[in-house]
Amino acid sequence: MAGKGLFITLEGGEGAGKSTQARLLAEALRAEGHKVLLTREPGGTPGAEEIRNLLLFGKVDLSWRAEILMHMAARSDHLDNAILPALERGEIVVCDRFHDSTLAYQGYGIGQGAPEVLAFLNGARKLVDFEPDLTLMLELPRPQALARLKARGGQTDRYEAQAEAFHERVLAGFDAIASADPVRVKRVDAGQTPEAVSAALLQAVHESLTVQGV
C-alpha cells in the first residue's frame, strides 16, 4: 500500500462481470464519502490504452515474451501516472485486472503453465514490483460465462476469441492464484444476483479498510 490509500483489484475470467462490479463498487464507496479512482488494465492512461488496443485488437500476432513485456509496459505507465498518485492522495483505487490476469492469461492460458514462461513472467513482474492490498476474485463456471457473453454481444477481442481449452487454463490459473494467496485474494461467487455480488464485494472492502486503517 502506498500513502494512505487502498489498492483493490478485481480479477476473473471472461463474462464474470468484473467491469460492471468494479463500477458498482466504486459508486458505493463514493456514496460512503471515499475518493475513488476507477481504472482498468491493460489501460488506464493514454499510453497504456494505446498498448491495450494493440494487445486486444492488433492485427499482428506477438510472441509470448513480447506480449508479457507489453502488458508490463502498460502497467508501468498506469502505475506511475494514475495508480500511485491516487494512492498517495489517500484515494481508494479500484482496478479491473492487474498482475493476476497477466499470470492467468499469459502464463497459464498462452504459456500453458510451462516453467520457462512462468519464470520469464515472474522476472518481468519483479520489474513492476507493486501488489494490491485486496484482490476480489469473481468466479463463474465457463458455461455460465459463455451464456453471458453471448447475451452481451459486441466486439470480440483477441483473448475472448481464444479456444475453450485456453479459457479453461485461464480459470485454472486464477484458481491456483487464489489458493496460493488466500489472505490477499477473496473469492466471490459471481453466479449470484448482481446485487448479492455487489454486497459481498463491498463487505470484503469494508473489512480491508478496517484492517488497513484507511
From Swiss-Prot:
PROSITE patterns associated with the record: THYMIDYLATE_KINASE
Nucleotide-binding listed as a keyword: yes
Pfam families: Thymidylate_kin
Binding site for ATP: G12, G13, E14, G15, A16, G17, K18, S19
Keyword set includes Transmembrane: no
Catalytic activities: dTMP + ATP = dTDP + ADP
Keywords on record: ATP-binding, Kinase, Nucleotide biosynthesis, Nucleotide-binding, Transferase
Disulfide-bond pairs as recorded: none
The protein's enzyme class: transferase
EC number: 2.7.4.9
BP terms from Gene Ontology: dTDP biosynthetic process; dTTP biosynthetic process; dUDP biosynthetic process
GO molecular function, one term: ATP binding
GO annotation, cellular component aspect: cytosol
Coiled-coil boundaries: none
InterPro entries (UniProt xref): P-loop_NTPase (IPR027417), Thymidylate_kin-like_dom (IPR039430), Thymidylate_kin_CS (IPR018095), Thymidylate_kinase (IPR018094)
Function as written in the Swiss-Prot or TrEMBL entry: Phosphorylation of dTMP to form dTDP in both de novo and salvage pathways of dTTP synthesis.
Family: Belongs to the thymidylate kinase family.
Protein name in UniProt: Thymidylate kinase
Organism encoding this protein: Gluconobacter oxydans (strain 621H)
Gene from which the chain derives: tmk
